[in-house]
Amino acid sequence: MQIRKLDTTQKSERARFVDFIFDLYKDHPLWVPPFRSEAMKTLDASKHPFYEHSYADFFVVEEGSQVLGRIAMLENRSFNNFHNTKTAFFGYFEVVENIDVARMLLQKAIEWAKAHDLDTLIGPRGVIGIDGSVLVEGFEHRPAMTIPYNYPYYDAFIKDSGFEKDTDYLSGYASGDHELPPRLYDIAAKVKAKRGFSIKTFSSKDEIRQWIPRAMAIHREAMSGLHSFFPPSEAETREVINSLLMIVDPSLIKLVMKDDEIAGFLIAYHDVSAGLQKAGGRLFPFGWFHILRDRRKTDWVNINGLGLLPQYRGLGANAVLYTELRDTIAAHGFKHMDIVQVNETNFNSRSDMETMEIKWYKRHRHYKMIF
């Protein structure tokens, strides 16, 4: 066995990194493949906006012609400049069930970070900054769209190399027909009437685009205190927004307004994981057909953003937000709701959701090592 840095200027080398996960999970009924084109773009410094400010190296462990594992090493300079830190990230970690292969990959990650004069290593996180984590609970459930799935041995393999838990993210389930207490609707009505809260809805993707600058400013305000946050560039913002708009139904995007100011948000989308499985990682020639058909048929919805800005909490606006969520789910006839990756330290959000009888059923993890 040997570990090798890939020459990512070569398409064949990028494909070697990407193809490995399709081989590793090809017989797994719950794994949801990424789009190959998007995965390939992640490695392409000439196409992905991450490389306008930062850099990454990609490694594989090989035995003969066979790939046994892979890992990426990143220095996100935007993150380090924002936090005044010297942090490296590892990402896209995938490995066969062989602890020696995992040790080779993770030791390379440690060596790479030290060689680049960085003193902390966190992962898995990718070039977007919000992508990547390791599933540690809930292996019997298919992941929500864009959320990682992996084999159960990953957690032990990573800890074996000296990493410790950094942060856990919880995903929760609720039945689509769950009823909220009538008093919550009474509170929401009073808050709207007396305190100037309202719901902003969208009728088209173009209308959503017009609101993106305001929404991103609010996003930065709301997230800047989190240790995982960094301000994305305009190009990175476009990258994420364009990916979201490919799949989003505008009627599932809502803003809570306080007079003319954004006070909170609801971001939901149809879970088309089954369609992505049928597409096999390709949009063409028939991938779009499977995805669009599943979007029409699915009775699952993913909630991937739900919250209020700090200054509007405690004013009754949470009643406005959660009743709007319930009404949106009912209007679309969803039977199942997946609340995606809530930071375990976000106690306010967790408490609100537990009041709504959300049951936490999946757990993802980031790991950390300080040198």
List each model region and its residues.
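Generic start-of-chain signal for non-secretory N-termini
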Residues: 1-30
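Short, well-ordered beta-strand micro-motif
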Residues: 60-62, 171-175, 255-257, 366-370
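Acyl-donor binding region in acyl/amide transferases
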Residues: 80-162, 279-355
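Acyltransferase donor/substrate-recognition loop-hinge adjacent to the catalytic core
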Residues: 148-228
